[in-house]
Amino acid sequence: MATFSRQEFFQQLLQGCLLPTVQQGLDQIWLLLTICFACRLLWRLGLPSYLKHASTVAGGFFSLYHFFQLHMVWVVLLSLLCYLVLFLCRHSSHRGVFLSVTILIYLLMGEMHMVDTVTWHKMRGAQMIVAMKAVSLGFDLDRGEVGAVPSPVEFMGYLYFVGTIVFGPWISFHSYLQAVQGRPLSRRWLKKVARSLALALLCLVLSTCVGPYLFPYFIPLDGDRLLRNKKRKARGTMVRWLRAYESAVSFHFSNYFVGFLSEATATLAGAGFTEEKDHLEWDLTVSRPLNVELPRSMVEVVTSWNLPMSYWLNNYVFKNALRLGTFSAVLVTYAASALLHGFSFHLAAVLLSLAFITYVEHVLRKRLAQILSACILSKRCLPDCSHRHRLGLGVRALNLLFGALAIFHLSYLGSLFDVDVDDTTEEQGYGMAYTVHKWSELSWASHWVTFGCWIFYRLIG
């Protein structure tokens, strides 16, 4: 790659990665986009509500079959089981808990090889959306935010809403009901769809081309110096960390691709808006890439990774688990996230590590903010905060230090998502030996740094 001239490099990049990636991406999603738009137009016709719900069920079923063929039966079975439990518990005040337990048992049975591992993991995205919607609806019914148990066609319409069933994101039952009302088409709506779709394709290109093309082209200047380094240990350590960062960035952009694509499909189908005085603001946001790549803190990374899911975990898991204590609630929240994403050792290890990293970072920065009276909390302070030091050089330096530490943690955690691993291994999940090997190569650095931060927090307490 380093022997290419600049013109040859960009020509190879265009023909070997950019164009094929965009073409394959559009080939995969054009039918889903068409179905979303067709449903959007259908709901503008003023049909009876039950026909609107039935149409989105039909669109959702067709989309599932297009992507997963007959494997979609496992998603259908989960949705039927959820409505059965909801109907049987319709007079209970703990419907959210009953639905959560039912879904937990179902997902655990699937993870324990009731179904072929590769098949099960292919379905986990759609299963996750169905599970999140069912649980949120149960708790909203318990809290009185939804007045009555939906009819079967309303319930299935919500779960199989064509704009979210394949790629997400999670939306509330209220947002779904607003979507099927068939709001007017507008320039703002079309602009939002086009922007989200363009960003999705850009992130897909970056995710696919970072490893084989972009990263090796831009890094060699530093890499050549490393290769001339007489100290092999230092050279090897730096190369391993660069590879870890490469894997992390590629994984990040694959997540942004799904996030922006889910924005496009949900908005195209009519969801994801807020009502202003004289117009609708199409403002659905799933991911904030800049907050992840240039973070203030790991807490900001976690919330910006997937905003709807972060809201769901906070509102329906963390708040309900707070009675167990803050740290226990954090662990329960990350455990729920691991189960929803498809329980595998490497994912559980990443999420458990994230739980400790974010908790230690939060309490340490909170303690330092109190001692120094400075705006160095994990989240940005409000304009009327009581801290004496807000924008000074020392405050900026500390925030930059914690931001650099967050990038360090992200590189370490992202090293598990190796861009060179074959698809079958990725679908089955990485085992314990692989996880231990990858983190051993990096000397377990992130865990040791987190432990050191916790010791420091205890010492200054």
Swiss-Prot record:
Its record classes its membrane topology as: Multi-pass membrane protein
Q: What is the effect of changing residue 365 to Q?
A: Impaired acyltransferase activity
In alphabetical order, the GO MF annotations are: O-acyltransferase activity; palmitoleoyltransferase activity; Wnt-protein binding
What result follows from mutating residue 312 to A? Does not affect acyltransferase activity
User: What top-tier enzyme class does this entry carry?
Assistant: transferase
Tissue specificity field: Expressed in brain, heart, kidney, liver, lung, muscle, spleen and testis. Isoform 4 is strongly expressed in kidney, liver, lung, spleen and testis. Isoform 1 is strongly expressed in brain, heart and muscle and poorly in kidney, liver, lung, spleen and testis.
- List this protein's GO terms for biological process: glycoprotein metabolic process; protein lipidation; protein palmitoleylation; regulation of postsynaptic membrane neurotransmitter receptor levels; Wnt signaling pathway
Give the intrachain disulfide bonds: none
InterPro entries found in the cross-reference section: LPLAT_7/PORCN-like, MBOAT_fam
Q: What is the effect of changing residue 172 to A?
A: Does not affect acyltransferase activity
Name the reported effect of residue 316 to A: Impaired acyltransferase activity
Residue ranges spanning the membrane: these are: 18-38, 67-87, 96-116, 153-173, 199-219, 253-273, 338-358, 397-417
Q: What superkingdom heads the lineage?
A: Eukaryota
**Which keywords appear in this protein's UniProt record, sorted alphabetically?**
Acyltransferase, Endoplasmic reticulum, Membrane, Transferase, Transmembrane, Transmembrane helix, Wnt signaling pathway
Q: Where is the active site?
A: 341
> Which residue ranges are assigned to the Extracellular compartment in the record's topology?
39-66, 117-152, 220-252, 359-396
Q: Which reaction does it catalyse?
A: [Wnt protein]-L-serine + (9Z)-hexadecenoyl-CoA = [Wnt protein]-O-(9Z)-hexadecenoyl-L-serine + CoA
Q: One Gene Ontology cellular component annotation?
A: endoplasmic reticulum
Please give the chief subcellular localization of this protein: endoplasmic reticulum
* Purpose: Protein-serine O-palmitoleoyltransferase that acts as a key regulator of the Wnt signaling pathway by mediating the attachment of palmitoleate, a 16-carbon monounsaturated fatty acid (C16:1(9Z)), to Wnt proteins. Serine palmitoleoylation of WNT proteins is required for efficient binding to frizzled receptors.
Please state what the protein is called: Protein-serine O-palmitoleoyltransferase porcupine
Please tell me the species this chain comes from.
Answer: Mus musculus (Mouse)
